[in-house]
Curated annotation (Swiss-Prot):
This is Sodium-dependent proline transporter. Residues 1-45, 557-637 are cytoplasmic. GO terms for molecular function: L-proline transmembrane transporter activity; proline:sodium symporter activity. The gene is Slc6a7. Disulfide bonds: none annotated.
Length: 637
């Protein structure tokens, strides 16, 4: 990789050397696209958008369960360690790439066109996730509307969707307290409401025969996409204002649920169950892997959302400070959500007379079965149910804004002349296409397809993308050069901590996660349903497709160059001639070349087009590159 970094230092820079064959058309490089691309209207827009993107549904329904099953309070030790080793450095790397270049996940690979396939893989992953994520928002909308009643519909048995196994677990009292119930032989009204009414899963014969479309879910999904479209209609200028509400209001609701939860009888029992340290769990590698997975997915690294949001920043936005605010805020929110969830579960376990571990679940089972059942035990249950699902709605929408903005930005940056003036129309077409592709999720067996997408769309493929990104930036482009870019942007170079993580610790951690996910692979399942072999194969191919986009992109990049294979690799790995800050005023240092007698420095590629070749002695960029190479040689000695 070092040879690839230094290959371009051996020749004087000429237009033919800097331009790929596809770049050699008659293009006016003086055109400035930064102004009409748009920016955040304020620094707080970006910060709240990042908080809303990271603080999502997983903070409520995954972290608390993961914590209590992996050592309780002891889980926080590997959690914060993995945050420091993997989460914060990768978060900062992705923000730095986006802000420095003002480009989306595809165009940002001007940094090294050889790896543009990683950007395409990001888009595939985020597209698949956006399809099923909005279905979860549709479920939330369904429950939100169902909460607008005097009595919650999942509170009692006796409805047409209930079976003879339905039992209202009210905790029958004995003289000394609560009689324990055998929950394994009965089904709660909330569980039958979810599976038999909302999903109507009994109408499906499996993933291969999903049954009919549920019109109520179909309408909820349509409403979810309409909301998303309206919020991203004007890009970050509209979504940046919506997040002032959607990123902050969940904290108010979470605080209300927390206060209500801790005042319930039995709440302390649930909190103890959640946070009592069990340090012997730290001896298990599984706990450390689970902590790393939680960090990796909760921060949204590798989906392109962080890169996209940062690309709309001004060049000198302090993303170093923002990185710590968002990542630590995300961690604290997860812990607080655990208190709100387990305080209510403790109350529920006391009312039912069963241990907390019999009522605690993760994922949709917590959001759509257990917590709704707990709400029925509270006074003013529709009010608390509405608040809970409204919180989930706002948490989900923030993340969905990022997913859609990532796709729209990536494609419009690739075709700015055609799509940027019609960005709103293009956004609408994307929403319509994804709504149509998501209709299979509204069928009786739609949950099976949702589980398949959730298990495979962003699994090992996402890890491969992030590892590739990390290595391409730090090893091929060069850690010294990348740190100089950050210095130009922020006024300081990242220290030893970030360099060590980018070069060694973060890739090693991700590689361990990748190996673990492959070795510990388990077939998908939903309840007692086991997926057929063809569905498992489809899921694996889904994950492999994103991985295969990386070598496919390399092949395309190499074929576009000329010369021998090694020369093509050198040229394809070299930064594109127009790589750098988008605004001419920010092109300083290695991105400016001053000709003898010139009164005003111009961007390097403008000089190359107007004045021809520049020898290495007159080229500031090449002098800086040589200085970088010398520093790297000294560090190796």
């Amino acid at each position: 990789m070092k040879k690839l970094q230094e290959a371009h230092l051996r020749k004087p820079i000429t237009p033919d050397l800097l331009m790929t064959p596809s770049d050699q058309g008659d293009v006016d490089l003086d055109v400035d696209f930064a102004a009409d691309r748009g920016n955040w209207t304020g620094k707080l827009d970006f910060l709240l958008s990042c908080i809303g993107y990271c603080v999502g549904l997983g903070n409520v329904w995954r972290f608390p369960y993961r914590a209590y099953t992996n050592g309780g309070g002891a889980f926080l030790v590997p959690y914060f360690l993995m945050l420091a080793i993997c989460g914060i450095p990768l978060f900062f790397l992705e923000l730095s790439l986006g802000q420095f270049s003002s480009l989306g996940p595809l165009a940002v690979w001007k940094i090294s066109p050889l790896f543009k396939g990683a950007g395409a893989a990001m888009l595939l992953i985020v597209g698949l996730v956006a399809i099923y994520y909005n279905m979860i928002i549709a479920y939330v909308l369904f429950y939100l509307f169902a909460s607008l009643t005097s009595n919650l519909p999942w509170e009692h048995c006796g409805n047409w969707w209930n079976t003879e196994l339905c039992l209202e677990h009210r905790g029958p009292k004995s003289g000394n307290g609560v009689l324990p119930l055998n929950l394994s032989s009965t089904v709660s009204p909330s569980e039958e409401y979810w599976s038999r009414y909302v999903l109507h899963i009994q109408g499906s014969q499996g993933i291969g025969r999903p049954g009919e479309i549920r019109w109520n879910l179909c309408l909820c999904l349509l409403l979810a996409w309409v909301i998303v479209f309206l919020c991203i209609l004007k890009g970050v200028k509209s979504s940046g204002k919506v997040v002032y509400f959607t990123a902050t209001f969940p904290y108010l609701i979470l605080l209300m649920l927390l206060v209500r939860g801790v005042t319930l009888p039995g709440a302390w029992k649930g909190i103890q169950f959640y946070l009592t340290p069990q340090f012997h769990h730290l001896l298990s590698s599984k706990v450390w892997i689970e902590a790393a997975l939680q960090i990796f997915y909760s921060l949204g690294v590798g989906f392109g959302g962080l890169l996209t949001f940062a690309s709309y920043n001004t060049f000198h936005q302090n993303i170093y400070r923002d990185t710590f605010i968002v990542t630590l805020g995300n961690a604290i929110t997860s812990i607080l959500a655990g208190f709100a969830i387990f305080s209510v579960l403790g109350y529920m376990s006391q009312e039912l007379g069963v241990p907390v571990d019999q009522v605690a679940k993760a994922g949709p089972g917590l959001a759509f079965v257990v917590y709704p059942q707990a709400m029925t035990m509270l006074p003013l249950s529709p009010f608390w149910s509405f608040l809970f699902f409204f919180m989930l709605l706002t948490l989900g929408l923030d993340s969905q804004f990022a997913f859609l903005e990532t796709i729209v930005t990536a494609v419009t940056d690739e075709f700015p002349y055609y799509l940027r003036p019609k960005k709103a129309v293009f956004s609408g077409l994307i929403c319509v296409a994804m709504y149509l592709m998501g209709l299979i999720l509204t069928t009786d067996g739609g949950m099976y397809w949702l589980v398949l997408l959730d298990d495979y769309s962003a699994s090992f493929g996402l890890m491969v993308v992030v590892i590739t990104t990390c290595l391409a930036v730090t090893r091929v482009y060069g850690i010294q050069r990348f740190c100089r870019d950050i210095h130009m942007m922020l006024g300081f170079k990242p220290g030893l901590y970030f360099r060590a993580c980018w070069l060694f610790l973060s890739p090693a951690t991700l590689l361990a996660l990748l190996v673990y996910s492959i070795v510990k692979y388990q077939p998908s399942e939903y309840g007692s349903y086991r997926f057929p072999a063809w569905a498992e194969l489809l899921g694996i191919l889904m994950g492999l497709l994103s991985c295969l986009m990386i070598p496919a992109g390399m092949l395309v990049a190499v074929l576009r160059e000329e010369g021998s294979l090694w020369e093509r690799l050198q040229q394809a790995s070299r930064p594109a001639m127009d790589w750098g800050p988008s605004l001419e005023e920010n092109r300083t240092g290695m991105y400016v070349a001053t000709l003898a007698g010139s009164q005003s420095p111009k961007p390097l590629m403008v000089h190359m087009r107007k004045y021809g070749g520049i020898t290495s002695f007159e080229n500031t960029a090449i002098e800086v590159d040589r200085e970088i190479a010398e520093e790297e040689e000294e560090s190796m000695m």
